[in-house]
């Protein structure tokens, strides 16, 4: 009995001390929650929109309770700057969803690792081997070849009157660009059903990453994985990792361990491993490639689809983009990489697409390992911190007519997407900014420019552009709720696509 009384006293004392400590903190405001589940039912099926509405009531730094998890939601450019830049070192750790622990991916992933020696090594390799300006310029011929394949495919659909799924076509191009750069081979044949299967694998990974999971909100449930998110994620991870491991083994056999001649990214990575396995262990390489393929292909293809849909559903904006292309490049002539810097209206349309439909509306969540002061509030240790880039892009205090597609707003405005302007952060900012930004911007700009300069488009059934459904859905990336399917009519000048591109 005395022991029981002692234990009760200890527990009560602990609760009183915790209550006293938290009462002295100024915690971020937020909506009241239900017992046990907290604010879980406030998210709905479109959490980026639900949280933006709640932020209008409770402020740009808002705290919700999702089961046992505290979630701090950032919905203003100034607060985002504090998290991503000013106090970056205090918010640099990642909150790892339970599904992403499948196949131990979180222990190798550049996107998910805390800022450890391995993370620093992977960032260094990305900066020096994958996405330097010199490497980007050296691989222009690869992008030209993939663009030629895309335009040839669209041209063939034009001749047959076949509707094109823009996201699927852009996805195929993105994957093959990355696979050419990394492995010197194409992973996808646009006319093959394998392309649909590969995209489905990537989408399932994005979907499982973004689906609310009880195991994230009630850690005691992680052991049993009640919704099966981690089990389903492991299936998709293993398929892609097995593919990459097979390609690595084949390359090692081909090279016989000699990597004096570097032909592609895989050669470069294997040489780093050969020279210093402590800098890059062989087991890390498939996970690095998984991050780059999944993040790069899906975000690029979804942005191309949104940009095309926005221009198509706003005929006056499409007309301006086409007139600029006709003036700078020539109507029906394939756009080259060096042309894109002379297309300010098209660049503005891409930025406006990012503003309205950022590919990852919550970026990648952060986690605090200690109590942190933020904008006059205390963010408690162990909190998940998410930046609602979608809400910032729709903030009427930052953007006039925030829900209207107006590329003109960016003309003459010194705002870019490189993490320096926190009104527009589709790739994040600070030291954890997306490393694939350079190649993503080059490729998606080229795809959009050529699709609108070399083809006219119409909806199936002859529906008017203004009737296009612009609703969205969310996995980890922001997708169109309904695929953008349109029928092309070629206006390519010259005898064929290859000639047009190489003139």
Curated annotation (Swiss-Prot):
Q: Which cofactor does it need?
A: heme
Q: Which residues cross the membrane?
A: 7-23
SUPFAM superfamilies, sorted: Cytochrome P450
Give the way it sits in the membrane. Single-pass membrane protein
Any one GO cellular component localisation term in the record: membrane
MF term (GO), any: heme binding
Q: What is its EC number?
A: 1.14.14.72
Give the subcellular location.
Membrane
- Its top-level enzyme class, in one word, is oxidoreductase
What this protein catalyses is: (5S,9S,10S)-drim-7-en-11-ol + reduced [NADPH--hemoprotein reductase] + O2 = (5S,10S)-(9R)-7-drimene-11,12-diol + oxidized [NADPH--hemoprotein reductase] + H2O + H(+)
Q: Which residues bind heme?
A: 471
- Gene3D superfamilies given for it? Cytochrome P450 (1.10.630.10)
The record's annotation in Pfam families points to:
p450
Keywords in UniProt for this one? Heme, Iron, Membrane, Metal-binding, Monooxygenase, Oxidoreductase, Transmembrane, Transmembrane helix
Query: Family per UniProt?
Result: Belongs to the cytochrome P450 family.
Function comment: Catalyzes the conversion of drimenol to drimendiol, a precursor of the sesquiterpenoid polygodial. Polygodial has been shown to be an antifeedant for a number of herbivorous insects.
Q: What is this protein called?
A: Drimenol monooxygenase
Q: Which organism is it from?
A: Persicaria hydropiper (Marshpepper knotweed)
Task: Write the gene name.
Answer: CYP76AJ1
